[in-house]
């Protein structure tokens, strides 16, 4: 609903924070597709935990939090192609990334047209 109603907004940048909470599977793919379409009209930033949504993105970053001496630290990392495959695989399969989850991640990225050889504009290395 948030994605659909934002189409009428005239702002150049849209930010979605976990717009995909409580969904999965086919619905997640639809949300990812709709976000990608919105990205053709304006800049879209989306926080997601779903690989189906992340795989639709043109660019992907990994955000992580750690706590040191009672202080919470946040880090953000732009993902190059190989790191993106590993992150999608982690999202698919959990902590232990296997050859099978890596292959599944590659297939998901290729199928969505967001990986080299499939029309991607992802950089080959991190900035």
Predicted regions and their residues:
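GG-anchored amphipathic helix commonly corresponding to the ABC/SMC/Rad50 NBD signature/C-loop
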Residues: 1-14, 38
């Amino acid at each position: 609903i948030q994605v659909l109603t934002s189409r009428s907004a005239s702002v150049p940048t849209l930010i979605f924070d976990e717009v995909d909470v409580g969904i999965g599977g086919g619905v997640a793919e639809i949300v990812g597709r709709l976000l990608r379409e919105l990205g053709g009209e304006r800049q879209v930033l989306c926080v997601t935990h779903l690989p189906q949504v992340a795989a639709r993105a043109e660019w992907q970053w990994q955000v992580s939090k750690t706590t040191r001496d009672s202080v919470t630290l946040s880090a953000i990392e732009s993902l190059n192609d190989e790191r993106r495959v590993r992150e999608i695989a982690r999202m698919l399969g959990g902590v232990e990334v296997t050859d099978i989850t890596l292959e599944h991640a590659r297939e998901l990225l290729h199928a969505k047209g967001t990986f080299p050889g499939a029309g991607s504009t992802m950089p080959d290395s991190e900035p």
